A protein has these predicted regions:
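Nucleotide-activated donor-binding/catalytic signature segment of Leloir-type glycosyltransferases, i.e.
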Residues: 289-310
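A short, well-ordered alpha-helix in the C-terminal region of glycosyltransferases
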Residues: 386-401, 407-413
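A conserved mid-protein helix/loop that constitutes part of the nucleotide-sugar donor-binding site
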Residues: 19, 23, 245, 249-268, ...
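Conserved acidic donor-binding segment of nucleotide-sugar-dependent glycosyltransferases
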Residues: 360-371, 379-385
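Membrane-proximal helix-turn-helix segments that form the acceptor-binding/catalytic region
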Residues: 133, 149-196
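Carbohydrate-associated surface elements
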Residues: 203, 223
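Short hydrophobic beta-strand element within catalytic cores of glycosyltransferases
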Residues: 321, 345-348
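Short His-centered aromatic/hydrophobic patch
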Residues: 105-110
């Protein structure tokens, strides 16, 4: 098959969704398919070809002003027409492709354009949903970036914008609400017109059921490349001394990632952490609060800010425990998938799709409250054999559920069913 992967997030400068798209591309290439990533590139002009870590890539240039909401229109509605034309051109270029074409959109910015192109050339279109973009303009599913809520409406946006942007900027943004709601309608329309929609977890699938009929909705997890991770983690991390035992937190220092809960956890578990350093790999608005918590409790801490992806993997492979106190509806955390591949003992809060990865007491530990989290953390810090056993089983689960061959086979079956 010839598989076109439009994606607005792609390595090297991206988060988990971009790396998931790249892992999918490599897995499909390894199984003999022709794969081309199609990536919008702000600030460029025209169309350029290249390669991104062994994945053939077509970059589609566009420009967007820095004016709020006008910028979003330029990055989406105005871009979709040009991007759809490019996708359609690539799907019908027989000098490049001779087998049947499948268009698999990887994220929100490209999904409507993929549907437009698919309708134009008669190719099946699949859309992967990896976060909350179908029902939340900001894709977090959090009102004011703090409180989970089901969907955005006039009333919710009127309070969300001031909570998110501040009173003055929020008030100035209120006239943009009609555009925001219309933009959400475009996103949902793309999902309704797609040949199939893939949810990365049961949690996201449940959220999508009101938008997508059951026969078009499929739960297929993201891929984690075990072989590549093994090669990377064969080298120790450079940001922490080899003889220093440490507990690890990786992520944005924001409320949705549970950074505010980490302050409470450190206060309650400071005695248990005396033999360990708490390594915090990430940055964000709550960094100062965490620094104050470390100073008050006298817990040894290393703030690494942002680190490259390989170093993050090496840290996970060598830490005694990964803390994941996420406070939002995690779609399917790439950090947790990669932690399983690294045999990392994980302590997490069971939000969103996390239970699809971590089974409490089998390949990790789950705790629903801060006191319960602290209790399990103290237990695991004092039980190295238990930690090792959880890490071994985590790797086994990654091999059974998230390995490239396992997930790519599920996608092949779906693609073939749509081409019949």
């Amino acid at each position: 098959m010839n598989i076109l992967l439009p994606t607005d997030v792609f390595p090297p400068h991206c988060g988990g969704a971009g790396w998931s798209a790249h892992a999918l591309a490599l897995a499909l290439i390894a199984r003999g398919h022709t794969v081309t990533a199609i990536v919008p590139r702000e600030g460029q002009e025209g169309i350029h070809t290249g390669e991104t870590f062994s994945v053939p890539t077509v970059f589609v240039g566009y420009r967007a002003p820095r004016i709020p909401f006008v910028r979003n229109y330029a990055r989406n509605e105005r871009l979709w027409i040009h991007l759809a034309r490019t996708i359609a051109m690539l799907s019908t270029d027989r000098s490049l492709h001779r087998a049947p074409v499948v268009i698999h959109a990887q994220h929100v910015q490209v999904a409507p354009a993929a549907v437009m192109a698919g309708l134009r050339v008669g190719a099946p279109v699949i859309i992967s949903v990896r976060d909350h973009w179908p029902w939340d303009y900001f894709a977090t599913g959090l009102h004011g970036d703090r409180i989970p809520y089901p969907r955005q409406t006039w009333a919710s946006l009127a309070t969300d914008l001031p909570a998110r942007l501040g009173p003055l900027r929020g008030a100035v943004a209120l006239p943009a609400i009609p555009y925001m709601l219309a933009h959400l309608a475009w996103r949902r329309a793309a999902l309704r017109q797609a040949s199939a929609v893939i949810a990365g977890s049961r949690y996201i699938a449940d959220r999508l059921r009101e938008l997508v009929e059951p026969d078009r909705l499929h739960v297929i997890p993201n891929i984690v490349d075990l072989t590549a991770i093994d090669a990377i983690t064969a080298t120790p991390p450079t940001s922490v001394p080899l003889d220093e035992p440490f507990v690890l937190f990786i992520g944005k220092l924001e409320r949705n990632k549970g950074a505010h809960l980490l302050c409470d956890i450190v206060h309650a578990a400071c005695d248990a952490l005396q033999r360990h350093t708490l390594v915090i790999a990430g940055t964000g608005p709550l960094k100062h609060d965490l620094e104050q918590a470390m100073h008050t409790t006298q817990v040894r801490a290393r703030f690494l800010d942002w680190i490259d992806h390989d170093e993050a993997l090496r840290l996970m492979a060598h830490c005694d425990l990964l803390l994941f106190p996420s406070a939002w509806g995690e779609p399917l955390s790439r950090v947790l998938l990669e932690a399983c591949a690294c045999r990392t003992p994980v302590l997490a809060m069971p939000t969103g799709g996390t239970p699809d990865i971590i089974v409490d007491g089998e390949n990790g530990a789950l705790a629903t409250t801060v006191p319960a989290f602290v209790h399990r953390m103290v237990e695991l810090i004092n039980q190295p054999e238990k930690r090792r056993a959880l890490g071994v089983e985590a790797r086994h689960r990654a091999e059974r559920r998230f390995a490239p061959g396992v997930v790519a086979a599920q996608l092949e079956t779906l693609y073939q069913s749509l081409l019949r």
